């Protein structure tokens, strides 16, 4: 659970009405732009957002800025989309969608996605490719998030017990980054030990929380099993009762993790969640579990009626009923994962591009316009990949709307980018 209360964060609880801030006129050079030598102009020069706490800025947010953003989501009743990315192209689509919707976003990498980011031609013994891919992706996000002018929580997804060396490698990278910049490379990590006994799950989470707290990082932990299949993990045959978390289990997590100084954490509590998309009626979500858990834990903590001490994560958001999504947000969900639907949207963009230009994609030379006409501009990968990105942006726009996460930044509509490089002799198509 995200430690948004004074007990869990070790900070004074913020008032429900967060102060509005105007946009400063000074140009901001963030650590990524400064370190990489990327000019910080246009959207990147935004110092703060009219509708968000002053600490929240363009680029990757960590520590107190991340907490302020998530606290704002809970207070105002929106959740932030968390999208699994496997290439720089999918990262860029997420950033574009966030700017178009005037909203923050969570970009996350799974172990398999991280390995793919590094390239399947790289050996993954001891998870070295997965570690390298995640770190490479993190630097790309840091470089480009500022340019798009949106705040990003940089996260990694399901880390089961057998994947702990992958997490250790990323933590080491964050420790080195923290020593140089005063903040971690990643904002947060997820530990998924839901298939382990509860006591072992909690013990390992406490161990990692202690290490992460020293860098102001957030830990997402999972209770109960998310069904379905994702990233090579198949839980399609799990017992139905294991898909639903009990309030008492969440309380055990709360007690253990809040004892760690500077602890920041969220809970991915199972309430019937399933990875993937299934026919209507096959998935039975019960968001009421989240509401009952809030009441139970608030009572245990002696908090006023109506308090939501837990910040929940909604796994398996693809294909979920909009009514279940809206209800879950009212019970304290501040993050919803989406992967299957964005995988489909990316592929569908390529599929539709191929269908539209099929007759221009069969040979290098020769098409309906003439046997001697070249087809280079059609099979240039930038064309089909851009179609995939645009399709993904469209799907994510729906996700932002479903999560009440539109206009959160207060910047207004995004102006259309100028993508023309100008006339050049011998230029490639742009």
Regions found by a protein language model. Give the residues of each.
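Alpha/beta enzyme core
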Residues: 64-72, 88-106, 110-127, 136-149, ...
């Amino acid at each position: 659970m995200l430690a948004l209360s004074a007990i869990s964060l070790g900070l004074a609880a913020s008032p429900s009405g967060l102060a509005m801030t105007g946009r400063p006129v000074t140009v901001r050079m963030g650590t990524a732009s400064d370190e990489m030598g990327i000019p910080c102009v246009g959207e990147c020069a935004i110092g703060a957002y009219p509708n968000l706490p002053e600490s929240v800025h363009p680029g990757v947010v960590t520590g107190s800025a991340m907490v302020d953003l998530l606290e704002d989501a809970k207070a105002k009743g929106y959740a932030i989309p968390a999208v699994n990315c496997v290439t720089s192209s999918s990262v860029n689509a997420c950033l574009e969608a966030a700017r178009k919707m005037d909203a923050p976003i969570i970009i996350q990498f799974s172990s398999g996605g991280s390995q793919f980011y590094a390239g399947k031609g790289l050996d993954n013994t001891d998870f070295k490719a997965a570690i390298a891919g995640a770190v490479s992706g993190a630097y790309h996000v840091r470089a480009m998030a500022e340019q798009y002018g949106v705040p990003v929580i940089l996260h990694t997804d399901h880390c089961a017990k057998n994947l702990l060396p992958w997490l250790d490698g990323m933590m080491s990278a964050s420790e080195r980054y923290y020593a140089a910049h005063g903040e971690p490379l990643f904002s947060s990590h997820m530990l998924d030990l839901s298939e382990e006994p509860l006591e072992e799950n909690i013990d390992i989470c406490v161990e990692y929380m202690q290490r992460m707290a020293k860098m102001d990082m957030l830990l997402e932990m999972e209770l109960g099993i998310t069904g379905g299949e994702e990233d090579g993990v198949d839980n399609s045959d799990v017992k139905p009762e294991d898909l639903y978390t009990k309030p008492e289990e969440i309380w055990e997590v709360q007690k253990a993790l809040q004892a760690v100084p500077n602890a920041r954490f969220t809970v991915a509590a199972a309430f019937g969640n399933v990875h993937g998309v299934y026919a209507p009626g096959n998935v039975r979500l019960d968001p009421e579990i989240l509401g009952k858990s809030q009441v139970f834990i608030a009572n245990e903590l002696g908090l006023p009626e109506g308090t939501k001490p837990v910040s929940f994560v909604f796994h398996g958001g693809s294909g979920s009923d909009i009514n279940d999504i809206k209800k879950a947000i009212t019970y304290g969900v501040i993050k919803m994962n989406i992967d299957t639907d964005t995988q489909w949207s990316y592929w569908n963009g390529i599929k539709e591009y191929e269908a539209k230009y099929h007759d221009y994609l069969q040979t290098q030379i020769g098409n309906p316009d003439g046997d001697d006409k070249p087809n280079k501009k059609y099979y240039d990968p930038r064309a089909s990949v851009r179609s995939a990105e645009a399709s993904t942006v469209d799907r994510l726009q729906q996700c932002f709307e479903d999560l009440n996460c539109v206009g959160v930044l207060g910047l207004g509509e995004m102006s259309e980018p100028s993508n023309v490089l100008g006339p050049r002799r011998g230029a490639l198509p742009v």
